[in-house]
From Swiss-Prot:
GO terms for cellular component: cytosol. Its EC number is 3.5.1.4. The gene is amiD. This is Putative amidase AmiD. Pfam families: Amidase. Disulfide bonds: none annotated. Keywords: Hydrolase. It comes from Mycobacterium tuberculosis (strain ATCC 25618 / H37Rv).
Amino acid sequence: MTDADSAVPPRLDEDAISKLELTEVADLIRTRQLTSAEVTESTLRRIERLDPQLKSYAFVMPETALAAARAADADIARGHYEGVLHGVPIGVKDLCYTVDAPTAAGTTIFRDFRPAYDATVVARLRAAGAVIIGKLAMTEGAYLGYHPSLPTPVNPWDPTAWAGVSSSGCGVATAAGLCFGSIGSDTGGSIRFPTSMCGVTGIKPTWGRVSRHGVVELAASYDHVGPITRSAHDAAVLLSVIAGSDIHDPSCSAEPVPDYAADLALTRIPRVGVDWSQTTSFDEDTTAMLADVVKTLDDIGWPVIDVKLPALAPMVAAFGKMRAVETAIAHADTYPARADEYGPIMRAMIDAGHRLAAVEYQTLTERRLEFTRSLRRVFHDVDILLMPSAGIASPTLETMRGLGQDPELTARLAMPTAPFNVSGNPAICLPAGTTARGTPLGVQFIGREFDEHLLVRAGHAFQQVTGYHRRRPPV
């Protein structure tokens, strides 16, 4: 286990390159101390060496990645620089459409699906000069379980530790230096779980902040697309590129997109709220981490006050039922016609969606609206809500074996995450501690709708005084 070295040596080997943050490697490419081709070749070698064990990639794209890297180098040599992502290897979750690679979404049904167009987020990455290096592994259909015939990504900190779902490949690859940032999705915690478990940084934006066009649905009104990186600064760079209105996605907001990375200094001290009454179900590692975060915020002068949130646990239960209905709709073309090709966890969830009565669904919709109204009232008093990034601290694979089948386990995990998919509020997940066995713990800063800029600035400030984001796994 080593700390990333902020002092960049004159010549970098594969290991040193892999430890750089996105913005650090981007600066070396921009100043031509490294070429994009060198960085891409180094990253591909690292993938070839480590990913047979880590299993973070569903598809690696060496030919197209190297072609994009060489094109980036030629552009930069001519003085045509597109911005921070130009020439930087980025991975995308395998539910984002890509014209040059299959999009299987963690399934076997779609393993040969070749989209005719890129997802909007992928098109925006390419337009910014990013090198798409591969498609990252995930759970089946972005739900809680892996398809039985497909490999499971391995946590680079500890192979016995859970890597999170469903953007597990994103978390593993970003932590292990197999890309310099990635694009994941989050329906109930799927950016925040892997970032927490793998010790990286992730943003679940406001619902509608980032286009979902060309992204395979799990549950349309809960799905959020966002970045996973090593730092808040890096996440700000990616979010600035992928956010914004899209004529192909009518649910995508026309709210103006600031340059989140242009000015990372806080313009005022944020007021932070914690509802301690809803943290009693968390384990000892999680509550100790939260207490340490509160002490850190107090030390830097941020007021932390007690707040009363609407009840989270009932909303997790409601979310589970409503998500199942939306998933059943999303899979109508292949389920039940090809039900035998689905894994058991995904099958059970879709079946539950088919069984839910319309009257109950409408009742749950009313509860969703009331929860969102109540949450907005809390944000009259605070700017940020504090929550762990998962309801269970760095569990083992054995502990999580029943996920998706054990309702109590699933509810415990999702209590601090899924309610904010229900409301659509943005959240940034930050490394914030470690367990006794050295595995990472994460904290969430949750903000008002479309207040990602404050979250990025607050996350950056937190990372300047903690440094957990500079830890690297022992691979």
